[in-house]
């Protein structure tokens, strides 16, 4: 099948999905599965393989995020119901003021994003975003948008995240220099993202009922309702902070051990297990069960109800995220990304813009930032021969920032951010998609300026 035909099929699929969700008000989970099925058949994937491809897409995403979203949601619900999120928000609001609090939380997200994967870190910070927004009496989008933006920037540009690490190997870039330059460029990108988010947030966006319940601006279900006694004596700032920092520190320890310890070290496997996001969040949840619930006089039944009340909202996020993975997998298997990349490679572009444009096109066409970065690295692996070490790093970063832009409905991260921030699909495209594209272009332009200097 020709490249043009594949691109038309992919474009028609995206348009159909937008019409189903925005105009026809079809549930995103159902719409994503339906469009994925139709695109798979139209793109020529054998009928007997379509089901396997869709299941692989669902499993590939849910295998990594289901447990994390579930545990993170329960931990966040316990912190929120105890009054801990508001306690933390009140403390920092008194110390910094509302405007500085947004900047401070964004800065914290930058450091959190270096060792922790984007989806894990954002899920951990979600209850804090709700708490700060509630205290400031503003939309959680004002906190969540710059926080998510800087975390995704670090995720695509800075080792030890998989995209930049794998691309460095393909493009012969030194990991040390990639880390240093990646962090250095991510800082001004984050600053631009912070102010871009402020401009985007000048408009008011409607929040979903689930997020309104989290903010206690809509009646919650009986199971998830907060008893007044739970918040009369909220936990202190130190306790709440520790419950957030502990899983992050454990994950960091696992990441550092994998980087510094030899593969044969007897403790490496144990440290990697403990440092996995799943185990780290389980440890934090057990601590919250003891410190926020049992020690504060909550009954076992009440504690169980609170933890259980987090799961319906988490289930929606999980299902829609998984369906987004299905759509992305179908687009990958259809060959649309590869065909597009090969077509762009035949156009005589300078090396740095080629790395960015190919990666951005792959990101927009099939959804996964990591796949976009890796594919670009593979396509350009021979083109970087003869470059000096810093130039190899800059080509790698150009590909990474291409993978940052254009996060939309075929990206599972789009659904995580929009669902947690209570955005509709249309508003998600106006906010999150616009912000990631601004961040991607900003990162590339700074990288190009550095290239010109050296």
Curated annotation (Swiss-Prot):
Per the record, the major location class is membrane
Q: Does the keyword Cell membrane apply?
A: yes
Q: How does it sit in the bilayer?
A: Multi-pass membrane protein
Residues that span the membrane, as ranges? 2-22, 28-48, 53-73, 109-129, 138-158, 175-195, 236-256, 274-294, 306-326, 342-362, 384-404, 434-454
Q: Which GO terms describe its molecular function?
A: gluconate transmembrane transporter activity
Q: Where is this protein localized, as stated in its record?
A: Cell inner membrane
Sorted alphabetically, the keyword list is: Cell inner membrane, Cell membrane, Membrane, Transmembrane, Transmembrane helix, Transport
A GO term from the CC aspect: plasma membrane
Q: Which of the residues are on side Cytoplasmic?
A: 23-27, 74-108, 159-174, 257-273, 327-341, 405-433
Q: Which residues lie on this side of the membrane: Periplasmic?
A: 1, 49-52, 130-137, 196-235, 295-305, 363-383
As for family, the record states: Belongs to the GntP permease family.
Query: What PANTHER family does the entry give?
Result: GNT FAMILY GLUCONATE TRANSPORTER (PTHR30354), INNER MEMBRANE PERMEASE YGBN (PTHR30354:SF25)
Record-given protein name: Inner membrane permease YgbN
């Amino acid at each position: 099948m020709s490249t043009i035909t594949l691109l038309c099929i992919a474009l028609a699929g995206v348009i159909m999905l937008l019409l189903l969700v925005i105009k026809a008000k079809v549930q995103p989970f159902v719409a994503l599965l339906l469009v994925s099925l139709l695109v798979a058949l139209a793109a020529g994937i054998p009928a007997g393989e379509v089901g396997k491809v869709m299941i692989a897409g669902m499993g590939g995403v849910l295998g990594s995020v289901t447990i994390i979203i579930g545990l993170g949601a329960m931990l966040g619900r316990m912190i929120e119901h105890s009054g801990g999120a508001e306690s933390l928000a009140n403390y920092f609001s008194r110390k910094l003021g509302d405007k500085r609090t947004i900047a401070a939380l964004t800065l914290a997200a930058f450091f959190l994003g270096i060792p922790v994967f984007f989806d894990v870190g954002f899920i951990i910070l979600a209850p804090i975003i709700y708490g700060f927004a509630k205290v400031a009496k503003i939309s959680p989008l004002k906190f969540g948008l710059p926080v998510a933006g800087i975390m995704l920037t670090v995720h695509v540009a800075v080792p030890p995240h998989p995209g930049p690490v794998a691309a460095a190997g393909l493009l012969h870039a030194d990991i040390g220099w990639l880390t240093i330059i990646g962090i250095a460029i991510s800082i001004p990108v984050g600053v631009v993202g912070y102010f871009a988010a402020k401009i985007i947030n000048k408009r008011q966006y409607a929040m979903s009922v689930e997020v309104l319940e989290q903010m206690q601006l809509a009646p919650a279900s009986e199971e998830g309702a907060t008893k007044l006694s739970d918040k009369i004596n909220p936990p202190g700032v130190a306790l709440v902070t520790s419950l957030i920092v502990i899983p992050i520190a454990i994950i960091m320890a696992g990441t550092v051990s994998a980087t510094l310890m030899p593969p044969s070290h007897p403790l490496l496997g144990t440290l990697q297990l403990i440092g996995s996001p799943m185990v780290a969040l389980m440890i934090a949840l057990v601590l919250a069960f003891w410190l926020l619930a049992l020690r504060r006089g909550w009954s076992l039944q009440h504690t169980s109800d609170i933890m259980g009340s987090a799961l319906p909202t988490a289930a929606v996020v999980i299902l829609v995220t998984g369906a987004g993975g299905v759509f992305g997998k179908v687009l990958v298997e259809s060959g649309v990304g590869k065909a597009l990349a090969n077509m762009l490679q035949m156009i005589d572009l300078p090396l740095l813009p080629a790395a960015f444009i190919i990666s951005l096109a792959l990101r927009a066409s099939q959804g996964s930032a990591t796949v976009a970065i890796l594919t670009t690295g593979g396509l350009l692996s021979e083109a970087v021969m003869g470059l000096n070490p810093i130039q190899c790093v800059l080509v790698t970063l150009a590909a990474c920032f291409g993978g940052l832009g254009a996060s939309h409905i075929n990206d599972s991260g789009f659904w995580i951010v929009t669902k947690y921030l209570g955005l509709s699909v249309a508003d998600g495209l106006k906010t999150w998609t616009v912000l990631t594209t601004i961040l991607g272009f900003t990162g590339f332009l700074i990288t190009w300026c550095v290239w010109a200097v050296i």
